[in-house]
Amino acid sequence: MVEFLNFEVLEDHGWALQDEDLFAKAADANLQSTDFGRFYVDPNDTLLEAAEKNGFAWPFACRGGACTNCAVAVVDGEMPSPASHILPPELTEKGIRLSCIAAPVSDDAKIVYNLKHLPEVSELLLPASRFEQASSTD
């Protein structure tokens, strides 16, 4: 089971990504279901695919680990990062992963999604329109 929280609500509530009780605060804050909730990840799905299957429109662009539009922070649980991706080691060491190519391997995980406003992540964003023009016949 993945418990998720939208990074954009942190500033509104005076919270920080490093807060130990971040998810307890979110549970008590009466947030919208798109900002805080839970869903299951099927074994063959990435985190992004699972979010979409559950009706959520999380940010992404390339779906291949070449940008940080889909970056998430793993607050609790295990979510290994595949070898091929754009994230520098200092971000992966902080628990940052790309939801388009990774999935939790622990039974439970706490994930903060929508990290595009985090300065270290925003430097590696790509415009989604760059990928919208690609097709399978290209």
From Swiss-Prot:
Pfam families: Fer2. [2Fe-2S] cluster binds at residues 62, 67, 70, 100. CDD domains: fer2 (cd00207). Its cofactor is [2Fe-2S] cluster. Keywords: 2Fe-2S, Electron transport, Iron, Iron-sulfur, Metal-binding, Transport. Residues 27-117 form the 2Fe-2S ferredoxin-type domain. Binds 1 [2Fe-2S] cluster. GO terms for molecular function: 2 iron, 2 sulfur cluster binding; metal ion binding. It comes from the Archaea. The keyword Phosphoprotein does not apply. Belongs to the 2Fe2S plant-type ferredoxin family. Ferredoxins are iron-sulfur proteins that transfer electrons in a wide variety of metabolic reactions. This is Ferredoxin-2. It comes from Haloarcula marismortui (strain ATCC 43049 / DSM 3752 / JCM 8966 / VKM B-1809).
